[in-house]
């Protein structure tokens, strides 16, 4: 929407949905899902992609005019993540990086110590850093203070489809952030992304929820609609929650009936 721009790292996007590419059953399905999602920014794991291979994910993104967001998936230390980001910048000519530093393979949760270390190094090196982080308001503030261009907290573990398990923390992060907050990981269906937007997130990043759905292209369209609906609801302002009913029709003007007089 022209009156509601999504600005990330100095670039304005029409879509607030950032897509991932992992888990798609084929390049054809991935391409159709990307089109259905309306995304303009899509992540690619640089440790798993050969930028020189034609017919790859990168060639699909180039053909569709979608900007590549390299990520450091698969890195377990700050050093690995920094090296991967620098290789991505050299290969793709972009300073934009989705920073991931994972604590272990079982949970795929971020390592907060290594993440903050890598973020500080990459910001100093001129990168536009978008960190995948825990839903921790304190860590979110430290990442913002380090110079990150956005905060990307998880709603629940990667690929779990559990949605946002701690909406209160998301609200705290959104209320104090001066940069965009983007849901990253945990979405399972369109209602999850709508909730994220209603809580005040500026955007949503997802992959598995679409690529591993029974109908990826259909789910991509659903996610697009969910993001748009949630954003509109946030801007509109929901009614307050109440313990008791409140009639929507006014009491003024109701007929006063005499119980002793017949109606007809």
Curated annotation (Swiss-Prot):
One GO MF annotation is:
thiazole synthase activity
> Active site at which residues?
98 (schiff-base intermediate with dxp)
State whether it acts alone or in a complex, and with which partners, per the record.
Homotetramer. Forms heterodimers with either ThiH or ThiS.
Q: Which organism is it from?
A: Streptomyces coelicolor (strain ATCC BAA-471 / A3(2) / M145)
Gene3D superfamilies (UniProt xref): Aldolase class I
* Annotated protein name in UniProt: Thiazole synthase
Membrane-spanning regions, if any?
none
Gene (name only): thiG
The entry's 1-deoxy-D-xylulose 5-phosphate-binding residues are: 159, 185-186, 207-208
What catalytic activity is recorded? [ThiS sulfur-carrier protein]-C-terminal-Gly-aminoethanethioate + 2-iminoacetate + 1-deoxy-D-xylulose 5-phosphate = [ThiS sulfur-carrier protein]-C-terminal Gly-Gly + 2-[(2R,5Z)-2-carboxy-4-methylthiazol-5(2H)-ylidene]ethyl phosphate + 2 H2O + H(+)
Identify the EC number(s): 2.8.1.10
**SUPFAM superfamilies according to UniProt:** ThiG-like (SSF110399)
């Amino acid at each position: 929407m022209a009156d509601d721009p999504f600005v990330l790292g100095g670039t304005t996007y029409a879509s607030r949905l950032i897509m991932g590419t992992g888990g798609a059953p084929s390049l054809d399905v991935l391409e159709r899902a990307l089109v259905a999602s309306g995304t303009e920014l899509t992540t690619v794991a640089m440790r798993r992609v050969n930028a020189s291979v034609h017919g790859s994910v990168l060639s699909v993104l180039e053909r569709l005019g979608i900007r590549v967001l390299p990520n450091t998936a698969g890195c377990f230390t700050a050093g690995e993540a920094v090296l991967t980001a620098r290789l991505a910048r050299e290969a793709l000519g972009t300073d934009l990086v989705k920073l991931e530093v994972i604590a272990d393979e079982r949970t795929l949760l971020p390592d907060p110590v290594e993440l903050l270390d890598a973020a500080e190094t990459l910001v100093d090196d001129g990168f536009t850093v978008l960190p995948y982080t825990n839903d921790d308001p304190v860590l979110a503030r430290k990442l913002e203070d380090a110079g990150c261009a956005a905060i990307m907290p998880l709603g629940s573990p990667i690929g779990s489809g559990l949605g946002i398990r701690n909406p209160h923390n998301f609200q705290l992060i959104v209320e104090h952030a001066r940069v965009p907050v983007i849901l990253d990981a945990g979405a399972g269906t369109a209602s999850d992304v709508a909730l994220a937007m209603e809580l005040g997130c500026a955007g949503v990043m997802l992959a598995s929820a679409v690529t591993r759905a029974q109908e990826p292209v259909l789910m991509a369209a659903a996610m697009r609609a969910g993001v748009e609906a949630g954003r509109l609801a946030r801007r509109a302002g929901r009614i307050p929650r109440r313990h008791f009913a409140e009639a929507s029709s006014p009491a003024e003007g109701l007929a006063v009936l005499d119980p002793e007089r017949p109606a007809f």
